[in-house]
């Protein structure tokens, strides 16, 4: 794979990046199962009154907890248990559950539904609190409520904010039709933000989670757009001469870094989120591309072949005029696609190793880097909002799929179950506001 193909102008090779796939519409079911050798045993009883609902809340909760790989679901039986019931801690502990969830769903006079639940620690024999959530009686509303409950459980028991109530974006190709899809974190409720007969690549979430920047070829060249999800409105932010690619948001959402071939070689520029104030940030005779802001907004990580082969560098967010770019990756001779974890401590990237491309994670303080996959065609890493997982694209069984892996490499990657179509270019959205 040449430098031009892998890195220089991703826009020119979109057809290669999202070429494979079948004809069926894809529904992604995120299956992060078996992650981690130690799992927290928890029993989630059926909620009272949920049996007649179009979507049972507890099935979403159990599915989320299982997919996280951090929990094992203990059979709670089929009898619903309300949050108001007295809890026999010893009985649940005897079943092997260190935590227990009880709840109910009740219809309000206005047609909405109130979902109440309480989480219990069966070891300490105490309540860990709960929530009272209002939702609509439809699949989307009940699933979102289930994700919120799972997030509460994850944070209370593990001390880390959950990412179940977040969203994914990815590109699906079905035949000659491309779709930019927005889905729940488990792949359900997928909605097309854009459908096109031309390639779509490089979706990137805004920090607010309300916008997605991406590259579309609908004007017969790569152009950067922003799509406002609540309104459905979209607009061009970069349609300069040559290629416009690799958009990346600043942490405040006011600026995007983009890669443009405006003067010949691809260089990195910044532009406001309204498409004004274009400013060049790199000035090299090499290819500089794939920018990504550090979470504190002080740095931009990017890929460049200025040293003879593609490596990841870091420069001040104001550009090289404010300080020389410094090389960051030294493991291997070919490293691309930088992504920094939300806490700024880790760098995920793709490294060419043994003729293949693997997902690596580097500790930015120590410089230690390790492969967290054993596959050979990994691409497009994206951290979860809590930094616990990395979503990425890979090849499996001759087709393109998505996969997730713990960012600490504590367990093997798990393929996300995809039915039909080619799924590429994943991006994990931020925490919901």
Swiss-Prot record:
Pfam families: PD40, TolB_N
Top-level lineage group: Bacteria
One Gene Ontology cellular component annotation held by this UniProt entry: periplasmic space
Any one Gene Ontology BP term: cell division
The keyword Thylakoid belongs to this UniProt entry's keyword annotation: no
InterPro entries, A to Z: 6-blade_b-propeller_TolB-like (IPR011042), PD40 (IPR011659), Tol-Pal_TolB (IPR014167), TolB_N (IPR007195)
Subcellular location: Periplasm
Cleaved signal peptide residues: 1-26
Keywords of this entry: Cell cycle, Cell division, Periplasm, Signal
Record carries keyword Signal: yes
PANTHER family (alphabetical): PROTEIN TOLB (PTHR36842:SF1), PROTEIN TOLB HOMOLOG (PTHR36842)
Annotated function: Part of the Tol-Pal system, which plays a role in outer membrane invagination during cell division and is important for maintaining outer membrane integrity.
Complex and partners: The Tol-Pal system is composed of five core proteins: the inner membrane proteins TolA, TolQ and TolR, the periplasmic protein TolB and the outer membrane protein Pal. They form a network linking the inner and outer membranes and the peptidoglycan layer.
Protein family membership: Belongs to the TolB family.
Entries under HAMAP family matching the protein: TolB
Name of the molecule in the record: Tol-Pal system protein TolB
């Amino acid at each position: 794979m040449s430098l031009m193909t892998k890195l220089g102008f991703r826009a020119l090779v979109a057809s290669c990046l999202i070429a494979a796939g079948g004809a069926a519409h894809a529904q992604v079911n995120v299956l992060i199962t078996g992650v981690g050798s130690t799992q927290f045993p928890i029993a989630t009883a059926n909620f009272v009154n949920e049996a007649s609902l179009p979507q049972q809340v507890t099935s979403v909760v159990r599915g989320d907890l299982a997919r996280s790989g951090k929990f094992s679901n203990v059979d709670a039986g089929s009898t619903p248990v309300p949050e108001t019931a007295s809890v026999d801690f010893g009985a649940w502990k005897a079943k092997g559950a260190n935590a227990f969830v009880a709840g109910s769903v009740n219809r309000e006079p206005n047609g909405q539904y109130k979902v109440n639940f309480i989480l219990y620690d069966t070891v300490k024999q105490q309540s860990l609190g709960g929530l009272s959530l209002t939702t609509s009686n439809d699949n989307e509303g009940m699933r979102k409520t289930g994700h919120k409950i799972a997030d509460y459980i994850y944070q209370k028991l593990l001390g880390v904010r959950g990412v179940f109530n977040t969203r994914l974006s990815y590109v699906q190709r079905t035949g000659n039709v491309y779709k930019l899809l927005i889905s729940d974190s488990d792949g359900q409720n997928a909605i097309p933000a854009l459908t096109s007969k031309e390639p779509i690549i490089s979706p990137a979430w805004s920090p607010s989670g309300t916008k997605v920047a991406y590259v579309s070829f609908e004007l017969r060249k790569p152009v950067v757009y922003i799509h406002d999800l609540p309104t459905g409105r979209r607009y061009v932010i970069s349609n300069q001469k040559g290629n416009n690619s690799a958009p990346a948001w600043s942490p405040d959402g006011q600026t995007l870094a983009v890669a443009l071939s405006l003067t010949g070689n691809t260089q990195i520029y910044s532009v406001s989120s309204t498409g004004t104030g274009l400013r060049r940030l790199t000035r090299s005779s090499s290819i500089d591309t794939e920018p990504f802001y550090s979470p504190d907004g002080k740095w931009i990580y990017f890929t460049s072949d200025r040293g003879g082969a593609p490596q990841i560098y870091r420069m001040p967010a104001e550009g090289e005029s404010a300080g020389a770019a410094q090389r960051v990756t030294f493991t291997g001779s070919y490293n691309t696609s930088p992504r920094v974890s939300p806490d700024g401590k880790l760098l995920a990237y793709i490294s060419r190793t043994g003729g293949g491309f693997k997902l690596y994670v580097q500790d930015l303080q120590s410089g230690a880097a390790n492969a967290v996959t054993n596959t050979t065609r990994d691409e497009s890493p994206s951290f979860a909002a809590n930094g616990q997982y990395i979503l990425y694209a890979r090849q499996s069984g001759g087709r393109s799929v998505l996969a997730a892996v713990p960012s600490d490499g504590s367990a093997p990657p798990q393929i996300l179950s995809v039915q039909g179509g080619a799924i590429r270019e994943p991006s994990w959205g931020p925490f919901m506001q």
